[in-house]
Amino acid sequence: MRHTFVSSTLAVLFMFASATAHAQGDGGYQLVPNWPKLPAGEFFGLKNAPPPPAEREAQAAARRAMGRPAGAAATPNPAGPTSQPGISGLAIDAQDRIYVFNRGAKPIMVFDTAGNLVLAGGDQELNGKKLNPNWQHSGAVDWEGNVYMIERDAHRIVKLNPKLDKVLLQLGTTDVKGNDATHFDLPSGIAVLKNGNIIVTDGYGNNRVVLFDKTGKFIKQVAKGAGGPADKGNGPGEWVLPHKLAVDAQETLYIIDREGHRLQVFDKNLNYQREIAVAGSNPWDIGISRKGDDGFAFIADHALERVHKLSLKDGKVVATWGKQGIGPGEFDWVHGIVVDSKGAVYAADTYGQRIQKFVR
């Protein structure tokens, strides 16, 4: 989660888009209080990770008083992986269980829709592979319940069994970066198709999206040139930081081009279809219902720390809510978002060190 400074020109666009989105209203989405129900002594993130929420809110208030966008720089960019507290990503399974990829004592925490903790793991050495929670960035759950966890700074992805006590597969080479069939450079997002094929956004070091089969065999990639660190572009199938992605019922892929301020749409074989512009937004994650058949997505937008409900047909924002802050319904680095089969939305705050659930 590397923060990119927003230029004054884009800041104007952000404010314009924010005003437009605000006119749409919140779509009737309301915060569910006290979700999830963390057991006594449990917490998300690093217990003593600075700066504390009150300090961040004071920084944001000072920026607002100066007429500067609080969301653009209210939270300082971390110097390294161990200084990023909180929740790096969310995933959801076929039973609507919410998987929290947590940079803390329990790297993976699983909750039911009522907010009860039902499983936790990833906090030990598994099959000789040390899992480091401070390196996490995102994850996914396949249709058999296996869990995929991106350890970004180790340049690898590990597949765990449903009980989270066995490593089944590794993609990438531990601590070795690259842009070929067996290496990543700071991978950022992942999705798994019904046939087990795996799509990875290899976005912080490289600029490519990669398709693997269920065994981890490289099939193809989509990128400008070789998809390396210098291979940025704004054309179809090119990227300026591919970040995260989601899949609908037809297994259409909606992939965030974070610094390109757009979604790129592909079929399940990574054939390009179209683009959905999200100008005025800094999209970090996208959530589509596990059923994936209602034609809408939810965007975690870091520009002004909001959630947008977006029509996948025409790209129009139909609802929006949130702002920079640590109060109810506010966000501080909203970096993960998922939607359950009943339409409830779950949004994760990295620096807020919490998850918020919204229903209507």
Task: Give the positions of each predicted feature.
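Bacterial N-terminal signal peptides
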Residues: S7-S18
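Surface-exposed loop and turn segments in beta-propeller and other repeat-based domains
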Residues: P33-A79, G121-K130, L168-D185, K217-G237, ...
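Beta-rich, blade/repeat-based domains predominating
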Residues: F43-P50, N77-Q95, L126-N146, V176-N197, ...
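Conserved beta-strand positions in repeat-built beta-propeller and related beta-rich domains
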Residues: V100-R103, M149-R152, V200-G203, I255-R258, ...
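Short glycine/acidic-enriched loop and turn motifs that connect beta-strands
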Residues: A105-P107, A154-R156, G205-N207, G260-H261, ...
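Short loop/turn segments that connect beta-strands within beta-propeller blades
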Residues: D112-N116, N161-L164, D213-K217, D267-N271, ...
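Blade-level signature of beta-propeller repeat domains, shared across WD40, Kelch, NHL, RCC1
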Residues: D332-R360
